[in-house]
């Protein structure tokens, strides 16, 4: 395949043109007065969104070189969204501003490597300032404010997320699902729930909904596969004497072991239910250990020198209640709170140490099941189009709220970035080279862009407002929703510090790559051949 090669200014100009096109499409969504973007779909209704990353994901340009620029900027939005859950439009606006100002300097002959170093130095100082300025959030009201802003100023979504987080805790699992009604509701699952149902419907205690319900139950947690009833007899006899129900969790239960358990259950001789252990491999072992700690029992494993034949009654786990259906098992725990807390701390440490996103996600699921239960936000809407858009907003708001709980919040509406720019004005840059000073200045100027865009989207000229913010006392900003000067924190116009910091860092990273690009290589576009395969029609020949 032949390639086109572009150098110097030719390459950079086209790349910047692609960045500008994507930025223009995304920036209209910024702020409380931001507009919607309509995205065509090959099948079904078009998508309506006010979410920056959703717009960015859809953009592919016809010109290969411009498209490379657009894809670079798209990376900023996606990376910021993955890391912080929000701030994608801010990151896009910042990246374009830094790239645009930087390329002006490169075009005038200033060394791009020095400019990049200056940008990195300014961003490091700015990020640290954002971290130090952050205010920790603790109340339900503050969480609702963050969630509402991230959900495009929808207070009902903010309140639902705050309610869910208040109930399950900051480490609890909150999932978002589509509701079958028009209303958005929250449902809760207490204790630990995992996706394993009973091995036989004959274990059911409620024949109407085919489910098992036990109160004050014993739980046998076993690593191995159980094939014969002989292995289980000692523990079954001990449980039978207590007249309490028993839940058996094992790798598998089959053959005459399962048949005997079903027979005893049907006859009413023993209240029992058997399920397969959740997870696979090492994760299964870890989850069984979690269940053991949650229920105050012992994990029966031959590796630990414990076999089924010598299990004592006090080594079994206990639960206030157990509910099992064909798909799920829920255990309401009675375990030692101190041991549960220690186990949770161990899992948190593993989350910090792992580099795999998949492992991190699974560890977070385990942590949530251990400490807080699960909240499900069921999103409802009148039309399917509205439902998809609303569900996406709820997911974004949830991610941003987690970021706010993690690192705190800063004044929103772009005012924090203005304050950071003013702080950079006070930094001594005398030891920086000329090129580095230019990079430093580029960041200072670019930090104003998000607020300029928010004000422009509200229909105002930004210069007057930017000047007033710089001269007013700290913490004041322009509320584009009500067109008033307000104290941003007191008015609940706040952004997660992690979102603001990630947006700036990711924007500067991609802009720096663009500035130091000297050559771009694209594939030569093949011209489409005449599909007819015949001779062209003589212009004089009309229709017969």
UniProtKB/Swiss-Prot annotation:
Asked if the keyword Nucleotide-binding belongs to this entry, the reply reads yes
Keywords (A to Z) from UniProt: ATP-binding, Chaperone, Cytoplasm, Isomerase, Nucleotide-binding
Q: Which SUPFAM superfamilies does UniProt cross-reference here?
A: GroEL apical domain-like, GroEL equatorial domain-like, GroEL-intermediate domain like
**Per its record, what are the GO molecular function terms?**
ATP binding; ATP-dependent protein folding chaperone; isomerase activity; unfolded protein binding
Please tell me where ATP binds in this chain.
29-32, 50, 86-90, 413, 479-481, 495
A cellular component term, taken from the record's GO annotations: cytoplasm
Signal peptide, first to last residue: none
Reactions listed under catalytic activity: ATP + H2O + a folded polypeptide = ADP + phosphate + an unfolded polypeptide
User: Which PANTHER family does this entry report, sorted A to Z?
Assistant: 60 KDA HEAT SHOCK PROTEIN, MITOCHONDRIAL
Q: What is this protein called?
A: Chaperonin GroEL
What organism is recorded for this protein?
A: Borrelia turicatae (strain 91E135)
Its ancestry begins with: Bacteria, Pseudomonadati, Spirochaetota, Spirochaetia, Spirochaetales
């Amino acid at each position: 395949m032949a390639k086109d090669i572009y150098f110097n200014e030719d390459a950079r100009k086209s790349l910047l043109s692609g960045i500008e096109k994507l930025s223009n499409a995304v920036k209209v969504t910024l702020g409380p007065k931001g507009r919607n973007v309509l995205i065509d779909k090959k099948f079904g209704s078009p998508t309506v969104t006010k979410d920056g990353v959703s717009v960015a994901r859809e953009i592919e340009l016809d010109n290969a070189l411009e498209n490379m620029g657009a894809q670079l900027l798209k990376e900023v939005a996606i990376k910021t969204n993955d890391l912080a859950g929000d701030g994608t439009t801010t990151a896009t606006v910042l990246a374009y501003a830094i790239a645009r100002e930087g390329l002006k300097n490169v075009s005038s002959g200033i060394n791009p490597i020095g400019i990049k170093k200056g940008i990195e130095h300014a961003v490091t100082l700015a990020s640290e300032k954002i971290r130090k300025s952050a205010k920790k959030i603790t109340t339900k009201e503050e969480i609702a404010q963050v969630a509402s802003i991230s959900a495009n100023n929808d207070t009902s979504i903010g309140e639902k997320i705050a309610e869910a987080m208040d109930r399950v805790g900051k480490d609890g699992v909150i999932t978002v699902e589509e509701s079958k009604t028009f209303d958005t509701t929250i449902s809760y699952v207490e204790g630990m729930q995992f996706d394993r149902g009973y091995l036989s419907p004959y274990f059911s205690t409620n024949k109407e909904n085919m489910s098992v319900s036990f109160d004050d139950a014993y739980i046998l947690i076993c690593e191995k596969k159980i094939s014969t009833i002989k292995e289980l007899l000692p523990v079954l006899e001990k449980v039978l004497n207590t007249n309490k129900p028993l839940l058996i969790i094992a790798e598998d239960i089959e053959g005459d072991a399962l048949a005997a358990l079903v027979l005893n259950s049907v006859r009413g001789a023993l209240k029992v239910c058997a399920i397969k252990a959740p997870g696979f491999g090492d994760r299964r072992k870890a989850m069984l250990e979690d269940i053991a700690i949650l229920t105050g029992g012992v994990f029966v494993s031959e590796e630990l020198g414990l076999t089924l034949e010598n299990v004592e009654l006090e080594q079994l786990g206990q639960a206030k209640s157990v509910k099992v259906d064909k798909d799920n098992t829920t255990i309401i725990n009675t375990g030692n709170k101190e041991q549960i807390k220690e186990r949770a701390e161990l899992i948190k440490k593993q989350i910090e140490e792992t580099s795999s996103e998949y492992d991190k996600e699974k560890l977070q699921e385990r942590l949530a099941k251990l400490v807080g239960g699960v909240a499900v936000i069921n999103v409802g809407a009148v039309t399917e189009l509205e439902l998809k858009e609303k569900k996406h907003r709820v997911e974004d708001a949830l991610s941003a709220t987690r970021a706010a709980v993690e690192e705190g919040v800063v004044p929103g509406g772009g005012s924090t970035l203005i304050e950071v720019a003013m702080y950079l004005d006070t930094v001594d840059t005398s030891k920086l080279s000329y090129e580095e000073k230019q990079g430093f200045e580029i960041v200072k100027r670019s930090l104003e862009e998000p607020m300029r865009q928010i004000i422009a989207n509200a229909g105002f000229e930004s210069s007057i407002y930017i000047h007033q913010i710089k001269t007013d006392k700290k913490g004041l900003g322009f509320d584009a929703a009500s067109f008033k000067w307000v104290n941003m924190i007191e008015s609940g116009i706040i952004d997660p510090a992690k979102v603001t910091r990630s947006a700036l860092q990711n924007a500067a990273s991609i802009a720096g790559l663009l500035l130091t690009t000297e050559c771009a290589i694209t594939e030569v576009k093949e011209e489409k051949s005449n599909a007819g395969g015949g001779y062209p029609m003589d212009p004089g020949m009309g229709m017969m």
